[in-house]
């Protein structure tokens, strides 16, 4: 927590920072859109999107009406997307600081990473909670491949469950593999299976953020 954040939030706790990561096409932007729409009437939200060379995700969120345009900031990371959320998160930390100058009462800052691999993780300096998203269309074997995104994220999301019959994926196998990969000495780390086209599983993701992030409505 920086002194900047404390100085700008004398009456409230610093905003909860929620990092959303996952491979290209897994549904990160759709999840962020749905979370914003589900939570913006209760909480003061802002969002940072990461793309390598464009600000396409920022545009998509704006067009969808997820949040007002001024509450969404696109960051062009260049190079490897994981660098901007892990090894050198300065570009995102600067973006957050800029957004909090404009919206000092923000309750939640969402940070969507650029599409990356299973090894992607957020720096603790950048994110308080991490959500890692994969999609069923990538194959039922993905959960058992492991990697920090699957094993260490605070919440693991298996998205696009509706596609399972079309790609020959067994959701039961994916669930069992996920349980095996996310079981630690302290117990099972949470995961959710979602179909965001029908909002299936969305309420569980919102509840996780509210409970784990100890949010209080604005």
From Swiss-Prot:
<keyword id="KW-0143">Chaperone</keyword>
<dbReference type="GO" id="GO:0016151">
    <property type="term" value="F:nickel cation binding"/>
</dbReference>
<dbReference type="InterPro" id="IPR004400">
    <property type="entry name" value="UreG"/>
</dbReference>
<comment type="subunit">
    <text>Homodimer. UreD, UreF and UreG form a complex that acts as a GTP-hydrolysis-dependent molecular chaperone, activating the urease apoprotein by helping to assemble the nickel containing metallocenter of UreC. The UreE protein probably delivers the nickel.</text>
</comment>
<dbReference type="GO" id="GO:0043419">
    <property type="term" value="P:urea catabolic process"/>
</dbReference>
<keyword id="KW-0963">Cytoplasm</keyword>
<keyword id="KW-0996">Nickel insertion</keyword>
<feature type="binding site">
    <location>
        <begin position="22"/>
        <end position="29"/>
    </location>
    <ligand>
        <name>GTP</name>
    </ligand>
</feature>
<protein>
    <recommendedName>
        <fullName>Urease accessory protein UreG</fullName>
    </recommendedName>
</protein>
<dbReference type="InterPro" id="IPR003495">
    <property type="entry name" value="CobW/HypB/UreG_nucleotide-bd"/>
</dbReference>
<comment type="similarity">
    <text>Belongs to the SIMIBI class G3E GTPase family. UreG subfamily.</text>
</comment>
<comment type="function">
    <text>Facilitates the functional incorporation of the urease nickel metallocenter. This process requires GTP hydrolysis, probably effectuated by UreG.</text>
</comment>
<keyword id="KW-0547">Nucleotide-binding</keyword>
<dbReference type="InterPro" id="IPR027417">
    <property type="entry name" value="P-loop_NTPase"/>
</dbReference>
<dbReference type="GO" id="GO:0003924">
    <property type="term" value="F:GTPase activity"/>
</dbReference>
<keyword id="KW-0342">GTP-binding</keyword>
<dbReference type="Pfam" id="PF02492">
    <property type="entry name" value="cobW"/>
</dbReference>
<dbReference type="GO" id="GO:0005525">
    <property type="term" value="F:GTP binding"/>
</dbReference>
<dbReference type="GO" id="GO:0005737">
    <property type="term" value="C:cytoplasm"/>
</dbReference>
